[in-house]
Amino acid sequence: MFICDCHCDTLTELYKKGTSLYDNDQHFDIKRQIELGGGLQFCAIFVPTHEFRYYGGLRYTLSLLDKYKKELKALQEKGIDVLPVLTKTDAADVLNHKAATLLAIEEGGAIDGSLEALRMLYEL
């Protein structure tokens, strides 16, 4: 069975708790995706604007992005097949992988009002 989990606070919770994308206490993780026969996990970078009102959102965004990239690299090094969905071609290929993730940035606090930051995040 293929499950798509759009519960987007996963990445934030992993960062705060220091837990892994592979096995955690959130609604869904990579381990459960594989056990169920496949899945897609949305991982949103959400900047709580009440904490980062005027600045700091970009730095927090980069911290979450770093956590995400490290988690994917660790899974890859262990030989675990996780597809990061980065393109339309990747999206079409999701069903051919045991697990997949889709990274998203939720709301504008992530860029601290900078279009340059937005362009650079897109490149990452």
Model-derived features with residue positions:
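N-terminal hydrophobic targeting/anchoring segments and the immediately downstream early-domain regions
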Residues: 1-123
